[in-house]
C-alpha cells in the first residue's frame, strides 16, 4: 500500500497537530517538515520551541475540553500528536471514536499514560509486569498511612507531573508532611493524587526506546528497539544520558519483553520511551511515555535515525531503522537564572571538538533549573562520551540581557 503525502499550505496538505511544543516536539516538527508535512503546533504559551519551526501555532489551555475541541475543528488535522500529559484526553477519545483524526499512538495510550496511576495499574495489575511496591493517596491522612505501609525510604510523585516536578525521596516519617506539600505544588492539572513507591535496589536505570511501525510489505505493525539508553537523574529530572548502556543478554531480553507487552497493550504506531530498573538479570518496569523521551536526545548523535525521525516515520506509516552508528552521550544545559531574553556565549569553544554538537531550544523564558539546551558527543566508549558531552555543556555560558 502506497504512502502518499501532499504539499504544505495546499489543499493536498497532510496535516499534523502537535499538542505541546517543547524541545522534543521541536525536533519532531523538523523531522515532519523534512517529509513535507504541514505542522500546526499548540502550547499554553507563545513562542514555544516547536512553534518556532511549525507552519502555524496556537496558544490555549489544552486541558480545557472546549478550547481543545475548537482547535481540532479549526485545523482539521490528519494526525494529532500529543507531546505532553496535560491534555483533555476525553476530547481525544471522542475524536478517535468519531474517526475525525488519528491520535498518536492512540487515544487509549494518551489517556492511560497521562497519569502514573493509569499506567501503573495497567502494567502491574493487568499485564502482571514486575514493578516496585506502590500505593496511591489523595489525602494527607491516607498518604501518611501509605508511606508507613510501603516503608522507608520511599519515593513520592504526583500522578500528573513531568521533569521531576513534585517528586521527592522520603527517608522517614518526619519528612512525610513536607513531601505531601511538595507533591501538591508540583502536580499538573490539580490532580491531588500521588503515588508512593518502594525503593528498588537497582544497578542502573535505562530508557528502552520502543518503536511500533507498520511493515511496508505486509501492513502489519512490528516492534523495533533502539539500543538501551543509560541515564542519570537529579530529583527526577534527566541530567545526562548515554547509549548504549551495557547490560546482560538476559536483562536485555527481559527489558524487550516488558517493553513489547506494555506498548502492545497501549497500541498504535510511534515511539515509546519505556523506563526500566535493572539489577543483574532482573528488570522492573518504571514508566512509559507514548512519545519521544528526553533521555533519547542522545540519539541525535548515536543513531542513523534519531528518536524524532523514528517517531515521524512511524506515525506516517514509513519504514524505520533503529540501528546505532556511534557511542554517544548527552548533557543538559540549564538556564541557571530566572530571566527571559537570554543569550548563549562561548559556543565556538564548546563546539571546538569535531565530535560534539549543541541544540539550543530557544525557550523565551529561563528558570534556574529549566532545560535550555543539550550538548551531545560521540567517542570510543560511554565514559569518554559522557565526559566530552558534559565538558561541552559546561562551556556554554548563559547570559542575561537587559
Swiss-Prot record:
Highest taxon, organism lineage: Bacteria
UniProt-annotated binding residues for N(1)-(5-phospho-beta-D-ribosyl)glycinamide: 23-24, 83, 294, 363, 370-371
InterPro entries on file: ATP-grasp, ATP-grasp_carboxylate-amine, ATP_grasp_subdomain_1, PreATP-grasp_dom_sf, PurT, PurT/PurK_preATP-grasp, PurT_C, Rudment_hybrid_motif
Catalytically driven reaction(s): N(1)-(5-phospho-beta-D-ribosyl)glycinamide + formate + ATP = N(2)-formyl-N(1)-(5-phospho-beta-D-ribosyl)glycinamide + ADP + phosphate + H(+)
Assembly and binders: Homodimer.
PANTHER family linked to this entry: FORMATE-DEPENDENT PHOSPHORIBOSYLGLYCINAMIDE FORMYLTRANSFERASE
Cross-referenced HAMAP family: PurT
Protein name: Formate-dependent phosphoribosylglycinamide formyltransferase
Annotated source species: Acinetobacter baumannii (strain ATCC 17978 / DSM 105126 / CIP 53.77 / LMG 1025 / NCDC KC755 / 5377)
Amino acid at each position: 500500500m502506497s504512502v502518499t503525502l501532499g504539499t504544505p499550505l495546499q489543499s493536498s496538505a497532510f496535516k499534523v497537530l502537535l499538542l505541546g511544543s517543547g524541545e522534543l516536539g521541536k525536533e519532531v516538527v523538523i523531522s515532519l517538515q523534512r517529509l513535507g508535512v504541514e505542522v500546526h503546533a499548540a502550547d499554553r504559551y507563545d513562542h514555544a520551541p516547536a512553534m518556532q519551526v511549525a507552519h502555524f501555532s496556537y496558544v490555549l489551555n489544552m486541558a480545557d475540553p472546549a478550547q481543545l475541541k475548537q482547535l481540532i475543528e479549526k485545523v482539521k488535522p490528519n494526525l494529532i500528536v500529543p507531546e505532553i500529559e496535560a491534555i483533555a484526553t476525553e476530547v481525544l477519545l471522542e475524536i478517535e471514536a468519531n474517526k475525525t483524526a488519528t491520535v498518536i499512538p492512540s487515544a487509549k495510550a494518551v489517556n492511560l499514560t497521562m497519569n502514573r496511576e493509569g499506567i501503573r495499574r495497567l502494567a502491574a495489575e493487568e499485564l502482571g509486569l514486575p514493578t516496585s511496591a506502590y500505593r496511591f493517596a489523595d489525602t494527607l491522612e491516607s498518604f501518611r498511612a501509605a508511606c508507613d505501609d510501603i516503608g522507608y525510604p520511599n519515593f513520592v510523585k504526583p500522578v500528573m507531573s513531568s521533569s521531576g516536578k513534585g517528586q521527592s525521596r522520603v527517608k522517614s516519617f518526619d519528612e512525610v508532611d513536607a513531601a505531601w506539600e511538595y507533591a501538591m505544588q508540583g502536580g499538573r492539572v490539580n490532580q491531588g493524587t500521588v503515588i508512593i513507591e518502594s525503593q528498588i535496589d537497582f544497578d542502573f536505570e535505562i530508557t528502552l526506546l520502543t518503536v511500533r511501525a507498520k511493515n511496508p510489505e505486509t501492513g502489519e505493525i512490528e516492534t523495533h528497539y533502539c539500543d538501551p539508553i543509560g541515564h542519570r537523574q537529579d530529583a527526577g529530572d534527566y541530567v545526562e544520558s548515554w547509549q548504549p548502556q551495557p547490560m546482560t543478554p538476559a536483562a536485555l531480553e527481559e527489558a524487550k519483553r516488558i517493553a513489547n507487552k506494555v506498548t502492545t497493550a497501549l497500541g498504535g504506531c510511534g515511539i515509546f520511551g519505556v523506563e526500566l530498573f535493572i539489577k543483574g538479570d532482573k528488570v522492573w518496569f518504571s514508566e512509559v511515555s507514548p512519545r519521544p523521551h528526553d533521555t533519547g536526545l542522545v540519539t541525535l548523535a548515536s543513531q542513523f535515525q534519531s528518536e524524532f525521525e523514528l517517531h515521524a516515520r512511524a506515525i506516517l506509516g514509513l519504514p524505520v531503522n533503529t540501528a546505532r552508528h556511534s557511542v554517544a552521550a548527552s548533557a543538559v544545559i540549564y538556564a541557571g537564572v530566572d530571566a527571559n531574553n537570554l543569550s548563549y556565549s562561548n559556543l565556538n569553544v564548546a563546539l571546538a571538538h569535531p565530535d560534539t554538537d549543541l541544540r539550543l531550544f530557544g525557550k523565551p523564558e529561563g528558570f534556574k533549573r529549566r532545560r535550555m539546551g543539550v550538548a551531545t558527543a560521540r567517542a570510543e566508549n560511554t565514559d569518554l562520551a559522557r565526559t566530552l558531552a558534559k565538558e561541552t555543556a559546561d562551556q556554554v555560558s548563559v547570559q542575561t540581557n537587559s
